[in-house]
Amino acid sequence: DAEVIWHELGHAIQDDQVPGFGVTHDSNSIGEGFGDYWAFTMSVPVSGGFDEACIADWDSVSYTSDVPHCLRRVDLDLTVDDQTGRIHHDGQIWSRALYDIHNALGRETADTIILQAQFDFGVDPSFAEAAQATVDAAEAIAGNGAALKVQKAFEDRGIL
């Protein structure tokens, strides 16, 4: 399943941008959420629109009973109030915000902003710190209108 590979590539990207990234629960959740988002955004051009928000649907057939089979989803309506203390679950809060940014700004602009923001993450950002870095990157790259859309995506998840 290419989405599994793209998810793992997301971890490699973050570790290259910020060596040692992922020290705390929040930063590990951000890492998992970004990995899921990266799998999503990389699959968009080749998915034909088929349940793009379902991550690793081919791989997860062997270990999930829900239909459709998804390792995780990037479109769940989760907020910080839904945290469970499990980084893969809680990462879906972060990935949903990134998914909303993608839908608001388009793939190329969203990916550029999200990737650029991560250069300003420390090894252990909180959700709020990473979100603010992403808003700041949106402002610098695409202007105030984009920054407001990015901020709203994080506000909708209770992150900002």
What are these regions (language model features)?
Residues 9:
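Active-site neighborhood of glycoside hydrolase catalytic domains
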Residues 1-6, 14-160:
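Zinc-dependent metallohydrolase catalytic domains
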